[in-house]
């Protein structure tokens, strides 16, 4: 009976987007506990946290081909339990090297799930002729925000390992049920996969879209890794609720994504991108100048809102260039986006070790200015055909 379970494809894909980052959100809220438990300074923590993006960066060149070879269903069925398990293993890490290795493995699984999720969402958009990409990523933000808030609430109740085990155990059956009856759109178009590393084979418009996403994901990676540490620095080492800064960032990122699809239809892709990037710039200005927590929280909110629609707009644009190469284009976009995740956090960490996090955050401005400039290159989806 369960095997015949059927979902509305739009509700189903949004549910999967919500579940996928939930345990990650719990882990992000627990980073200050891991840092103090392993006695890591800011630069050591930055090095350890490079594990996840390094794993994703290693896998993404092949993720598009794997998605087409194995199919989205198999990747979901295998990827979710392995992904949840590897994140849970971070609770067993007893040093920088083990933490890096476990996060690397989580990054490998996460890359396959990320590409598969975005490719599937793009296919659902084309099949249903509904604009849903921003809302899908809104549910992703809602999932990571909920996980972060749960992690903040539970961090004093148990160990990092037990909290992660409880959350992963509760979410695994939910993820499995959501993936049952996943519609197959594999044959809607004949997908051609090209080698990701051969940049000249990709159109110039895709490169511009990737540059736009790069500036956005630097911010996302920086906030994911350092927002909780920023709040802890501001409130003191014994402070409670250090995950609320990232929780607010993720909440407003989710809010922006839920309204993003309608705004894109009414105002156009390029204008929406510009306005939101400017919001992120204003939020970052507040973060590097704030002297109290409440003002900093306003900065987190504006920054989260500002970067909210960036990656979804980039995914839709990349998937709309050529139906036959959507998996390759989305994989390449994800690769460049993950480089943003990889570059931002360690630079901030090393600067913070010498000065403070506010100085590190200043290094995020050039990426946002680059995204603002490249926002004019974004394109809108045209269902059932190519966008020239």
Where is each model-derived feature located?
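Short amphipathic helix-loop junctions that connect adjacent transmembrane helices
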Residues: 29-43, 225-241
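Interfacial helix-cap and linker-helix signal at transmembrane-aqueous boundaries
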Residues: 34-35, 66-67, 153-158, 231-232, ...
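Helix-breaking motifs and short loop linkers at transmembrane-helix boundaries and internal kinks
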Residues: 39, 71, 92-97, 236, ...
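Conserved MFS/SLC helix-loop-helix module at the cytosolic interface between two early adjacent transmembrane helices
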Residues: 58-97
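Helix-to-loop junctions at the C-terminal end of transmembrane segments
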Residues: 59-71, 155, 256-269, 352
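Structural signature of the two symmetry-related core transmembrane helices
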Residues: 74-88, 271-286
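Cytoplasmic helix-loop-helix junction between adjacent transmembrane helices
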Residues: 103-138
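Symmetry-related core transmembrane helices of the 12-TM Major Facilitator Superfamily/SLC fold
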Residues: 162-180, 359-377
């Amino acid at each position: 009976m369960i095997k015949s379970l059927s979902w509305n494809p739009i509700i189903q894909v949004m549910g999967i987007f919500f579940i996928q980052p939930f345990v990650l959100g719990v882990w992000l809220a627990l980073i200050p506990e891991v840092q103090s438990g392993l006695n890591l300074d800011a630069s050591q923590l930055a090095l350890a946290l490079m594990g996840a993006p390094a794993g994703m960066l290693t896998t993404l060149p092949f993720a598009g081909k794997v998605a087409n070879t194995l199919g989205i269903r198999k990747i979901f069925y295998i990827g979710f339990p392995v992904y949840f398990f590897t994140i849970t293993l971070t609770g067993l890490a007893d040093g920088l090297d083990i933490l890096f290795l476990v996060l690397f493995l989580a990054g490998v699984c996460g890359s396959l799930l990320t590409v598969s999720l975005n490719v599937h969402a793009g296919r659902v958009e084309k099949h249903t002729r509904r604009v849903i990409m921003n809302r899908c990523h809104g549910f992703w933000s809602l999932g990571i925000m909920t996980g972060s808030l749960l992690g903040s609430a539970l961090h004093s109740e148990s160990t990092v390992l037990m909290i992660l085990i409880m959350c992963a155990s509760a979410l695994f059956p939910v993820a499995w049920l959501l993936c049952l009856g996943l519609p197959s759109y594999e044959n809607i178009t004949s997908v051609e996969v090209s080698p990701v590393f051969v940049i000249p084979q990709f159109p110039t418009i895709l490169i511009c879209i990737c540059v736009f996403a790069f500036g956005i994901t630097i911010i996302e990676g920086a906030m994911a890794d350092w927002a909780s540490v920023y709040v802890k620095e501001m409130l003191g080492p014994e402070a409670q609720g250090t995950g609320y800064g990232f929780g607010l960032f993720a909440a407003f990122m989710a809010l922006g994504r839920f309204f993003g699809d309608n705004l894109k239809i009414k105002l156009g892709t390029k204008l929406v991108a510009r306005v939101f990037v400017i919001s992120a710039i204003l939020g970052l200005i507040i973060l590097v100048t704030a002297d109290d927590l409440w003002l900093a929280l306003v900065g987190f909110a504006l920054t989260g809102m500002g970067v909210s629609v960036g990656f979804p707009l980039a995914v839709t644009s990349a998937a709309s260039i050529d139906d036959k190469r959507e998996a390759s284009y989305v994989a390449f976009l994800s690769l460049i986006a993950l480089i943003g995740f990889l570059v931002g956090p360690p630079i901030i960490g090393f600067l913070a070790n010498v000065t403070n996090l506010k100085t590190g955050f200043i290094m995020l401005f050039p990426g946002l200015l680059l995204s603002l400039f490249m926002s004019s290159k974004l394109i809108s989806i045209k269902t059932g055909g190519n966008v020239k």
